[in-house]
Amino acid sequence: MKRLLGLLLAMMVMMGGMAGAQASTDNASMQLIRMNPLAFRKEPVGLYSVTHTPNGSFVVIYFAEGEKTELQEMWMELFDSVGTSLLSAKLGEFDPNGEQIPHGQIILKKDRFICEYYPDITSMEVCTQTVYRYTGKRIQKPTTKKLKFGAAPYAQHVGDYMVEKQAHSEDETPFRTVKITHIASGKSKKLMIYDWSFCACSDQDGNLLIGQQNEKGNLEIRSYNAAMQESIVELSGDFLQNSYISDAACIGQTVYFDIYLTNQQSEILFYDMKQQNITDSQTLHTANDNSYIAEIKAAGAVLLSVDGYWNRELQRQKYQINLLNEHFETSRLPLQHESCLYIFTDVEQADVTTIEMDEKSHSYFVCSYSISAGE
């Protein structure tokens, strides 16, 4: 089952004295650009997802305690780029010890976004949709519809695109229906993907890249531009035996494919887009045995790995950011707070945005950093 970096989040308000504070390691320096407190409508007991929008705002879906002690609520909240709350809405309530667990997700459009709420993630046969502007104005009231089993997608924001993956299937066909959409133009394409754990990333030219192990067992790399023009490269998949493509990141003309080996170890393949071939590989390890490799990320020309681990005391998933040198040795990047709950990087600039929590006060912050590799 594909490792999920369960995007957890909370964010922002400027704390002027902090900007310019700098920390460094032997291999990297990280400078805090800004840190803003994040005031939620209700105190989160867990962050479910964070989605960045085209205008720099972001949408957080989170869990909060319900009015009745045995229930929890799922909320959606929109924040602008400096952490001001523009919109908050209760999506639904549920029994955390019950059989039905909800799912909420955001689908981005050019000038609006759709908030979807499914009361039961195991079937996703009932969906309530509400449409908002990025300013927070609601432009369509909630509408509830029933879906056939297998019709609902999981939505993922990847660069300039939305990737909607078929969530469930009872069909005999092994292929998964996937819809990709260029957010700004609205152009879309429907794909049939064999590998249910395929990965997607964006390159610095604004293209969408999809890596999968196809029905022949080979590594298949697909590329799509804004006009939905497709190119496909197929390479030997001998290295994929008893494994799968867990993640991918792109820097310049090189795509780094994360091939899962164990929770603490991956093989990173270097794919040269010009040569259309694998040119190198390196082994990636977690910093310690108590964590797992959550994902790899590109921040400008800097390649990062993210380790995830479970904080038993706080009952929350937390993350650690590592800079990778040319030998794939890791250097932990220092953050302002011990609990990092969400990480977003810019593929064009060496910037990292995090959602962090102060463990004593349970206050949330959105922090922006610039990263540079050391000498």
What spans do the regions from the language model cover?
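Positively charged n-region of N-terminal signal peptides that target proteins for export
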Residues: 1-6
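Bacterial N-terminal signal peptides
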Residues: 8-16
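Surface-exposed loop/turn elements that mediate protein-protein interactions on large endomembrane-trafficking
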Residues: 24-42, 71-94, 121-148, 172-192, ...
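Beta-strand-rich domains and repeat architectures in extracellular enzymes and scaffolds
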Residues: 39-71
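Repeated scaffold domains used in trafficking and secretory/extracellular systems
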Residues: 43-52, 96-109, 146-159, 193-204, ...
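Short beta-strand elements that form the blades of beta-propeller/WD-repeat-like
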Residues: 56-65, 105-122, 155-170, 206-213, ...
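Solenoidal tandem-repeat scaffolds enriched in leucines and small polar residues
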Residues: 154-158, 163-179, 190-221
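Blade-level signature of beta-propeller repeat domains, shared across WD40, Kelch, NHL, RCC1
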Residues: 341-375
